[in-house]
């Protein structure tokens, strides 16, 4: 079976490996090299690096909307196109090119969390489970019928990065299962998504990373987890802007103004919130690296309870 794979970030690499394990991946589509690092030199995507290492031809069009790019895809004569976090819109004409259409690996239990950031939004919302769907793509945003799915519990300690890695591996397994069925001549049953329960996972914005102490401590703790490793939550701590890599919510009544330092010890720095308190465990000062609360307190001798 001739497969064209389209993906860009690290999340898609496991799925590319799964597709290449028992099938012929005739080409990989990925976004053009982008500026990265302090030198802003052009850097290849993780998917491109994996494809090159495997000797798979790589295509990097800026868009798939023009006829030349679509003809290039037709010339590959794909039986199936697998799309995993590609980042470019696939026009209807492209969806119709492969014999079996286009499959997408999506990191949520559709129709919940359609869109760009399903992993982080699930944590932020306090969901107790998520999963992966293998979807038959259509013109709408993540609206296609689901072929296979697999659930995954969300641990109360999961960060965005940790859940990302778990779902990347789960996505590869679900894709492998689907490809195995197709190879055996069995096309998975396409089940339309329910009309109820649709939510959208909008793209992350750095502005969202600024914590407002007026909010509930539980919600703030979930934001800290969801936004690690990017964009990393930040807040004002006794007059200093800090980034917060690790924190837990405390269910306690305090009667203090939001943002007040309630306690400070090696275990963490407790900050009054609109409801409860947030214990900061891992912080980062401007221009510095992530450090424990104990190390932060050693560096900030001026920090006082009640500030």
Swiss-Prot record:
Signal peptide: none annotated. PANTHER family: METHIONYL-TRNA FORMYLTRANSFERASE, METHIONYL-TRNA FORMYLTRANSFERASE, MITOCHONDRIAL. Its EC number is 2.1.2.9. GO terms for cellular component: cytosol. Keywords: Protein biosynthesis, Transferase. It comes from the Bacteria. This is Methionyl-tRNA formyltransferase. One of its GO terms (molecular function) is methionyl-tRNA formyltransferase activity.
């Amino acid at each position: 079976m001739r497969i064209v794979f389209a993906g860009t970030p690290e999340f898609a690499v496991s799925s590319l490996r799964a597709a290449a394990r028992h099938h012929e991946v005739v080409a990989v589509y990925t976004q053009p090299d982008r500026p990265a690092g302090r030198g802003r030199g052009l850097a290849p995507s993780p998917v491109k690096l994996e494809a090159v290492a495997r000797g798979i031809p790589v295509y990097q069009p800026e868009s798939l909307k023009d006829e030349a790019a679509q003809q290039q895809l037709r010339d590959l004569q794909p039986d199936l196109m697998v799309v995993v976090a590609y980042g470019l819109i696939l026009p209807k004409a492209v969806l119709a090119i492969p014999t079996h259409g286009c499959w997408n690996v999506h990191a949520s239990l559709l129709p919940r969390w359609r869109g760009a950031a399903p992993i982080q939004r699930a944590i932020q919302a306090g969901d107790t489970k998520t999963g992966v769907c293998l979807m038959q793509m259509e013109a709408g945003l993540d609206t296609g019928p689901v072929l296979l799915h697999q659930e995954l519990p969300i641990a109360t300690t999961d960060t965005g990065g940790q859940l990302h890695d778990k779902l990347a591996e789960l996505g590869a397994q679900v894709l492998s299962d689907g490809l195995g069925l197709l190879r055996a001549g069995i096309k998975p049953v396409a089940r339309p998504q329910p009309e109820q329960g649709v939510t959208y996972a909008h793209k992350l914005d750095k502005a969202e990373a600024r914590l407002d102490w007026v909010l509930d401590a539980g919600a703030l703790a979930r934001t800290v987890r969801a936004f690690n490793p990017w964009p990393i939550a930040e807040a004002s701590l006794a007059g200093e802007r800090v980034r917060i890599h690790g924190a837990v919510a405390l269910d306690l009544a305090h009667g203090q103004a939001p943002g007040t330092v309630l306690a400070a010890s090696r275990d963490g720095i407790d900050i009054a919130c609109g409801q409860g308190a947030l214990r900061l465990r891992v912080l980062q000062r401007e221009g510095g690296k992530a450090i424990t609360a104990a190390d932060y307190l050693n560096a900030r001798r001026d920090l006082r309870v009640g500030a």
